Amino acid sequence: MLKNYFKTAWRNITKRGFYSLLNIVGLSTGIVFTFLIGAYVWNELQVNKKLNNAKNQFFLKSEWKNPNQGLEITTLAPLSKRLKEDYPNLVANYYRWDGITSTLSKGDKVFREGLQIGDSTLLSMYGFSLMHGNAATAFEAPNAVVLTKERAIKYFGRTNILGETITIESFSGTKQDFQVTGVLNNPARNSITHITDDNNNQVYISNKNLDYFGRNMDWNNPYIVS
């Protein structure tokens, strides 16, 4: 019986070739687009899913009277710290970072990279795990740097690089060696390391180095992500 169904279907296809082809192409296109849309929606739903207490994580966004005063995704540098101090029962933790682009070098290899200068709470706040290093002390030293697994391999060709150094240039042109104190497992998709399509930070430095880069965390700085 099933064989007869196939024969009938094939007869109809060959008898009405153009319309059959049109229907098949239309159906195939619809199925493909359905899968593509489903894949896109699923991918978007996975953003931040792996963060600690993801449902209780919030970005501070700003609405400036003067649009040129700052960005919607940034706010005044001390704000989240002040909120934690003034409302300890409401704000359990915070993480602020300033994104910059700088030149990194290792031997004769030179790289232009986005850096994230932030609070030492990065790992405890979001639950990112280190494959090498101590999460409790990774950002204690002023010249400490934490790299993702991807960047460790890019710069050194391996991941077990604790104690190794990489040179980072400031905006004034001075160069300083930073010691690798942690190697981060490549994080699942999130809006902390990849806040925009143009921003994908994989090099993390303690905010103790703000002066080296000519940055600050005072009320005059409206370009801090919190």
Language model regions located:
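Short amphipathic beta-strand/extended segments in non-transmembrane regions
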Residues: 58-63, 76-131
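N-terminal Sec/SRP start-transfer signal
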Residues: 1-31
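Short acidic, glycine-rich loop/turn motifs
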Residues: 64-66, 104-106, 168-172
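Generic structural signal for small/hydrophobic residues in well-ordered secondary structure
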Residues: 13-16, 23, 44, 60, ...
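Solvent-exposed, non-transmembrane alpha-helical starts
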Residues: 67-78, 109-113, 140-143, 187-201
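Mid-to-C-terminal secondary-structure elements
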Residues: 119-132, 147-226
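Alpha-helical transmembrane segments
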Residues: 22, 29-58
